[in-house]
Amino acid sequence: MSCYLLSYFLLFMEVKFIQILKLTIDNNTLSEYEKYYFKQHPKARKKPIQNPYHPSINEWMVMKRPMMNALKQKYKDFIIWFIENQGYTNLHIKQCEMIFTTYYKTNRRHDVDNTTPKFILDGFAESGFIIDDDWKHLRQITLQCS
């Protein structure tokens, strides 16, 4: 069984210390979320999140506005659940740096700049995990593919 991972390393820069958190979204995380999701939406048949990594910017930028908003909402709901499940809701991180590492299921060529985690960052802000995803609070983003 292939394992797809999207890992986040977060460096929290408080007054005198740096704390590192590693958050991982994999197939097990998606399975847990699907159980929760289908309990909340018993008539739903389709998985809300297809892969444990953010959709490529090439996929969602060409969508019509309603489809893109629906995808964004699904990811926001998923990330809010994920952060709550990790126990980090309303952490309100003031400043941080993030490293996003995406492990794809194939060795097909991927452009690292297409992995922009916009929907995930919006979910982080909405859940209260970070204060906001603006430049004052999110000082640096590093994108990696493996």
Regions found by a protein language model. Give the residues of each.
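Catalytic phosphate/metal-binding cores of nucleic-acid and nucleotide-processing enzymes, i.e., regions
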Residues: 2-146
